[in-house]
């Protein structure tokens, strides 16, 4: 096999007259009046190859037998295309290769779908034949971008003096967060390793060890219900530092992300990124990861409507809730009564009992609840919401968390439906000043908002075991276009504070020691102040590549039900394997 001289997609007018050797796949073959044209594809693109009997009759005869997706080697000379034959859609469209020789390296069955961009095929089939799906240029380009992003992160962290240190994949199962994937031990029957949800504790121990600056591009595993931007295994850019403030960690993160966007998209992002407290994000956007590319902010109108004779509003306020509204500017004409009823059904998915609405027409409020607003209250509401003719006013009344969840989701939906989002914009945002705990309604207790190793704000440490709801965290999330792409914090580095944290979470001293004794021991040996952040590589690439599903950025992903159609994982194992592990499966009873 002759050595390749060029990739197909690299050929241009500078190569005219040169002899080249190309390897690739047959994208398309056309027989036109004694000439055969083959579009040859490799990872860099497509080039047209011409087989002319006057130039090589033998090559033409072989080319006549090839079919789509055959793997071939072609030797020939680069020529300029005629002016009428130029293909502006191809990067190589001004040249073609006149073939002298062709060698068929391997044949191909007819693929189950065309290997081209924009092909209409189910996700299930794409994943079953993922090796074919990945041949498509748009998929190839995503993984080129992923490589660029990963390389840029590595180069930046290396330049900043970070050490790339691996941590184990077989670790100890610990509570909090998502369910663990468990791995049975053959040597110790009845005992299990866990695949890490993150290297959190181990990277903290590396700070105790004195490494000062650590990073790792690491696989993480979480057995949780899936959605479009989640996978059971994913990759994060994980870093930890000692002796730095959270502002310094944020600055490092911004430097990395600015470099990544420049390398991957050739877009310059301004620093520093905007900052917003958790409370402000929830108040204004109804989300702890707000998309700030568009408006439609939530506005609290409780004071305006508290005296309005509308029982839904009155009841919510009397029960400690609130009334908030979104003013969809100039959108009234876009929504019929049926459309507005559908929005009511939509917000019900987020706990709302309904969606009240008003339209502004000829200076007056119109709609089912307009009758509850006397002239003075109508005027006050219009001022509060800066409402004008043509505006659509949407209201939710309930407990604060339900109002935030329902209107926050509605805001995102309206942003898309009304085409308010500039899809080319990249809007980074820091969300800071998080509560240390959040209340779990099902468990009827407070749980960690991030993880149990997050440092409380110093002034709140005395409240850990007495008034958990008021404790704030030294935590910070980084958001991009409405997606959380990273979370970080300063960490607890003193044993007594960590013990207090565990007690606040409901651990007994005995259970804390059983689960985290090794960490508690380490905190007694001069652990320095430290903190870090973990960035979701898959999600960052997804956003930069303009995709809406993580599956497109992972070479061999799972479906929404955590199944791999390519390998049929997960699958059953043999009785012999189970016996070796001292395991038995529980058979489901069938009626």
Curated annotation (Swiss-Prot):
Pfam families: GAD, tRNA-synt_2, tRNA_anti-codon. It is found in: Cytoplasm. The keyword Cell membrane does not apply. Keywords: Aminoacyl-tRNA synthetase, ATP-binding, Cytoplasm, Ligase, Nucleotide-binding, Protein biosynthesis. Residues 200-203 are annotated as: Aspartate. It comes from the Bacteria. GO terms for cellular component: cytoplasm. It catalyses: tRNA(Asp) + L-aspartate + ATP = L-aspartyl-tRNA(Asp) + AMP + diphosphate. GO terms for biological process: aspartyl-tRNA aminoacylation. L-aspartate binds at residues 176, 222, 450, 491. PROSITE patterns: AA_TRNA_LIGASE_II (PS50862). ATP binds at residues 222-224, 231, 484, 536-539. It is an enzyme of class 6 (ligase). Its EC number is 6.1.1.12. Catalyzes the attachment of L-aspartate to tRNA(Asp) in a two-step reaction: L-aspartate is first activated by ATP to form Asp-AMP and then transferred to the acceptor end of tRNA(Asp). Homodimer. This is Aspartate--tRNA ligase. It comes from Listeria monocytogenes serovar 1/2a (strain ATCC BAA-679 / EGD-e). The lineage of its organism: Bacteria, Bacillati, Bacillota, Bacilli, Bacillales.
